[in-house]
Design a protein with these regions (language model features):
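Aromatic-anchored segments of alpha-helical transmembrane domains
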Residues: 18-23, 92-99, 159-172
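Membrane-water interface at transmembrane helix exits
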Residues: 37, 53, 73, 98-106, ...
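Membrane-helix interface segments
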Residues: 48, 63, 78-83, 148-155
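Alpha-helical transmembrane spans of integral membrane proteins, capturing the lipid-embedded, hydrophobic core
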Residues: 14-18, 66, 87, 91-95, ...
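Membrane-embedded catalytic cores of phosphoryl/pyrophosphoryl-handling enzymes
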Residues: 3, 118-223
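Alpha-helical transmembrane segments of integral membrane proteins
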Residues: 8-13, 81-90, 152-155, 176, ...
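Interfacial segments of alpha-helical transmembrane regions
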Residues: 9, 68-97
């Protein structure tokens, strides 16, 4: 069970996202975004690190987090299985939220506006704001921090931060795109986790799912 502080923090994060969204939409952060993007994308570019950050940006979202969910469910105890289910629900909500935001608001990606942008991966055609990668990985990291032991959650948080940074490094997002996505991902994760973990219907569904899973394994003579 999560305390009301979890819900309050989630709401605060969502409000902060709305402020970031307004600042970006009205162009208040444009100069900051251009300067910091150029500093990271060009000024901090190191050829020997390009492969690492390209890999992080290409494989750090679904190719990383789907196996995490599967491992938690297959090999974890009851709490880890519960975390896996919460992650699935949070990810579904975040995907829908991200797609809706990108459909309703368009911001050109950096290489379309900045001639000096160094693009290291193919450029998507959808809106730059918010970063879908940051949205998903930070949502996953926050659920992990809430529900898993630190020896698991802290490496997952580190992975999420690396992916967020990589989106600027490879040239596909402005800093505020990433910050907005990360803040929204955290806010939604906190709010949804609070609701689920305090809802008897979720616990009943989870217990039923675990029983069904164990029965299937038993019939297959795997346990």
């Amino acid at each position: 069970m999560q305390t009301k502080n979890t819900l309050l923090l989630g709401i605060i994060f969502i409000i902060v996202f709305l402020v970031i969204f307004a600042l970006v939409a009205y162009g208040v952060t444009a100069s900051f975004d251009d300067s910091v993007f150029t500093f990271i994308n060009s000024g901090l570019n190191v050829n020997s690190l390009n492969f690492f950050f390209i890999a992080a940006t290409n494989y750090g979202r679904e190719y990383f987090w789907i196996p995490v969910v599967m491992l938690l469910w297959l090999f974890g105890k009851k709490n880890e299985k519960r975390a896996a289910l919460v992650l699935v629900i949070v990810f579904i909500i975040l995907i829908i939220t991200g797609e809706a935001l990108k459909y309703g608001y368009y911001r050109a990606r950096p290489p379309l506006s900045l001639s000096n942008a160094l693009l290291l991966v193919p450029l998507d055609s959808d809106s730059s704001f918010p970063s879908g990668h940051a949205l998903i990985v930070m949502g996953g990291a926050v659920v992990s921090l809430l529900m898993l032991r630190k020896r698991y959650s802290l490496p997952l948080l580190t992975e999420a931060l690396v992916v967020c940074y990589s989106r600027i490094y490879v040239g596909v997002h402005y800093p505020m795109d990433v910050l907005g996505g990360a803040v929204l991902g955290a806010g939604v994760a906190l709010t949804v986790a609070y609701i689920l973990l305090n809802a008897s219907i979720f616990e009943s569904f989870f217990n039923s799912l675990v029983r069904t899973y164990n029965e299937v394994l038993h019939r297959m003579h795997l346990i």
